[in-house]
A protein has these predicted regions:
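Solvent-exposed, acidic/flexible segments
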Residues: 28-32, 43-44, 60-64, 94-96, ...
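Core segments of small alpha/beta cavity-forming domains
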Residues: 25-72
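Short, gly/Ser/Thr-rich active-site loops of penicillin-recognizing serine hydrolases
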Residues: 38, 562, 656-665
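Second-shell loop/turn segments in exported
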Residues: 22-25, 36-37, 53-58, 104-106, ...
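N-terminal Sec-pathway targeting helices
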Residues: 1-14, 19-22
């Protein structure tokens, strides 16, 4: 019996031993598992944990610190990510396993692919026999991996005639050669700082950078190449050196500053958010430089290669040629842009000029403005505070905002009334004097107008004399439903598809016109109505184009043809009636824009003054407007002009001679 039990025990032990052996073999660390774990640690940048996967022989050859430093410098230096391997073969050699595999990884120059092999030793699990050629097959322990970057040329921004609005220019780089400073280094540094408008601490910080030697040229600040007096003073200080450097340059400077925008060195936050840049890259900060950044910036050229201990190029791992940025040609006429800026530069205002036949935007002027060439060079904190705290907001692109249109809205009221058949050109209203209210339900609320005139109170005469009372009554006759649906059709409360962001025009704060008094005020361009200047230019183009609103655009097209933004924005008859009436605003001796007459040129236009106040009793600034277009001309122009603080300068009549000179040139 005991013998039987012993035999059974022995059999069980044998079975258990066999089972344990097979379980051990099944769950034993496989060499390919170690390789895959190693690659996973590379992707996770866990260099210390990579080191733990090395065999003892490798650890004796390289310390953990040196291993981490070498791998980290190489992988981070080439901007490696997403390494993947495909095992091709596993060869046994005693306790060793030799794995051949194909590796792929993303790097700053693109994808790097190579075949390689790795040897693993079974040391209580498979461990890696490591050397530098595990990083790249051709890499020896004394070699280095280098990354060479070639910067592309940033694309130019050109006007319609090919003139550069933004391109490459030169400036003067002010620097210091430390070994050539005089013995009175502190005194000289303070003097340099004072002349450059910076702190001595900022200079010393640059001089203390790790790469600086006595013979190094240490750039301190870039200034305009024309700063000859400043440069002469600086060169009198020992150790100062001035070199020429390339910069982004803007030929129109202030005249197109909000339009072109400007570039500056990328910030840390921008570098984290955007791909394809380095810490020294320039990036568009505002305007078209920002809008077209992806097209203008180009693509860096990158070469990643192995260099031997003698500094010789040994193997190119990947090479990507640089791609220069795209040149972008605009519809802008730089001469017109400059002329209009010169007219308005001392005021707070804007001009939008468009070809009403094609939609080409010929000028976008906003005043006052900053010198974008100074922004590229860099401004001091005091200079920046002066700009950002300026009450006249010189960085604001006024043409992108929305404003009360005043009487320039009256043609739109007329156009909606005629198009909806809720108003006819022959309709007349009965009232006398310069003040009117519908009835006693309005209480003390009255509509006022500036000028009494003889003749019928009809649409044409009301436009000629800019009669507020007529258009208030016309709006009431049109009705809230027709008015709001007509304005919705004109794309109020919508984003206008344009190259730059534009504020949405509105007819009220809540998207409704419910009160009679608000509807009446809306009729003559007051109330809560706010219109974007580019949008109103597009609306006025419908009076030129028999009712079709033309889409404005900024990027030049050969053989320009119009894109209709709103078909039949007004009926053909309505558009032609308004156009003919606006011609009389200029041609009629009593017209509010009679000063705009130019011999041989037919012009349709409308003056406007918008009151910026919340009640009739309040006194506040006004906005002056003048919107006009040439009729039946070979090269038609449509102008929208606005000036703030119009009660100080004559408003729309201040703008008329400016536009007149621009058309006559």
């Amino acid at each position: 019996m005991k013998k039987k039990i012993l035999i059974i025990v022995i059999i069980v032990l044998i079975i258990a031993g066999i089972g344990g052996y097979f379980y051990y073999k099944k769950n034993q660390n496989k060499p390919e598992d170690t390789l895959k774990e190693y690659v996973s640690k590379i992707n996770e940048e866990k260099y210390n944990e990579m080191y733990e996967l090395l065999n003892e022989n490798s650890k004796n050859k390289i310390s953990e610190e040196d291993f981490v430093t070498r791998n980290k410098k190489i992988y981070q230096g080439i901007d490696m990510s997403n390494m993947k391997i495909e095992v091709k073969n596993i060869q046994k050699s005693g306790k060793k396993r030799i794995i051949t595999y194909t590796a792929k990884m993303d790097a700053s120059g693109g994808e790097i692919t190579f075949d390689n092999e790795i040897t693993l030793n079974n040391e209580k699990g498979y461990k890696i026999d490591w050397s530098s050629n595990l990083i790249f097959p051709e890499l020896e322990d004394t070699d280095k991996v280098r990354v060479s970057t070639s910067k592309p040329s940033r694309g130019k921004i050109l006007d319609r005639n090919g003139k550069e609005l933004a391109g490459e220019g030169t400036a003067s780089s002010i620097g210091i050669v430390p070994g050539k400073l005089s013995e009175s280094k502190e005194e000289d540094t303070n003097k340099i700082a004072e002349l450059l408008g910076i702190t001595a601490d900022s200079i010393n910080k640059k001089l203390q950078a790790g790469w600086v030697t006595d013979d190094s040229f240490v750039p301190i600040k870039t200034v305009s190449a024309n700063e000859n007096e400043l440069k002469d003073k600086l060169l009198q200080i020992k150790g100062v050196k001035i070199t020429s450097t390339k910069i982004r340059s803007y030929s129109l400077g202030e005249a197109a500053s909000q339009l072109t925008g400007y570039v500056q060195t990328i910030t840390k936050e921008e570098l984290e958010e955007n791909e394809g840049y380095t810490s020294t890259s320039l990036i568009g900060k505002t305007g078209l430089e920002q809008k077209y950044e992806a097209r203008l910036k180009g693509k860096n050229g990158v070469e990643i290669y192995i260099e031997d201990k003698d500094g010789k190029r040994k193997k190119t791992l990947i090479k990507q040629d640089k791609v220069d940025g795209e040149n972008i040609k605009l519809t802008i006429d730089s001469e017109l842009q400059q002329n209009l800026y010169n007219e308005l530069k001392n005021d707070e205002g804007l001009f939008v000029v468009m070809n009403p036949a094609t939609g080409e935007v010929l000028a976008l002027v906003s005043t006052p403005a900053i010198d974008v060439n100074k922004m590229v060079l860099g401004v001091t904190s005091d200079e920046w505070n002066e700009i950002s705290n300026n009450e006249k907001t010189p960085m604001l692109a006024r043409y992108s905002q929305k404003y009360c249109p005043g009487s320039t809205f009256k043609p739109i009221t007329g156009g909606i009334g005629l198009s909806t058949n809720s108003l006819s050109a022959e309709d007349t209203f009965s009232y006398s004097g310069l003040s009117w209210q519908k009835d006693a339900s309005w209480g003390t609320y009255n509509i006022t107008t500036l000028t009494a005139y003889n003749g019928a109170k009809n649409l044409k005469n009301a436009l000629i004399h800019s009669d507020n009372i007529y258009f208030a009554q016309a709006a009431l006759k049109i009705g809230s439903k027709n008015m709001t649906s007509g304005l919705d059709k004109l794309k109020f409360n919508e984003d206008i598809d344009f190259d730059l962001n534009l504020a949405k025009s509105q007819y009220s704060n809540n998207g409704k016109i419910e009160k009679e008094t608000l509807l009446a005020d809306t009729g003559y361009g007051q109330g809560q109505i706010l219109v974007n200047p580019v949008h109103i230019a597009s609306i006025y183009s419908a009076f030129y184009n028999e009712g079709n609103m033309i889409k404005p655009y900024l990027e030049f097209k050969e053989n320009a043809s119009p894109t209709i933004l709103v078909e039949n924005a007004f009926s053909k008859d309505a558009a032609n009636e308004i156009k003919n009436d606006l011609i009389q605003v200029v041609e009629n001796p009593e017209g509010t824009a009679k000063d705009m007459r130019i011999n041989g040129t037919t012009i349709a236009g409308k003056t406007g003054t918008a009151e910026l106040k919340s009640s009739k009793d309040e006194k506040a600034d006004t906005i002056g407007w003048f919107d006009c277009f040439t009729v039946n001309s070979e090269n038609p122009y449509l102008f929208v002009g606005m000036v703030e603080k119009a009660n100080n300068n004559g408003g729309s009549h201040y703008l008329i001679p400016m536009i007149k000179r621009a058309i006559s040139k």
